From Swiss-Prot:
UniProt KW Secreted keyword: yes
Species, as recorded: Rhodnius prolixus (Triatomid bug)
Keyword set, alphabetical order: Cleavage on pair of basic residues, Neuropeptide, Secreted
Main location: secreted
Cell compartments where the protein resides: Secreted
The protein's name in its UniProt record: Orcokinin peptides
Length: 69
């Protein structure tokens, strides 16, 4: 019983490694493309909008939170 289990595990492990290599490499390529999009577009979009929100909303929130003397 243990021999069958270990040989079946070895076969599964080998197949998983083959799938893992091909799948993971394509994932890395997609990740690289996402990083390029992230740097050029998304970063600038988030920073610009966050700065506007920060000035308008968060700044007034801090002023309201200050104790009055």
């Amino acid at each position: 019983m243990s021999f069958f289990y270990s040989s079946a595990y070895a076969a599964d492990k080998r197949n998983f490694d083959e799938i893992d290599r091909s799948g993971f490499n394509s994932f890395i390529k997609k990740k690289k493309n996402f990083d390029e999009i992230d740097r050029s577009g998304f970063d600038g979009f988030v920073k610009r909008n966050f700065d506007e929100i920060d000035r308008v909303g968060f700044g007034s929130f801090i002023k309201k939170s200050e104790p009055h003397h």
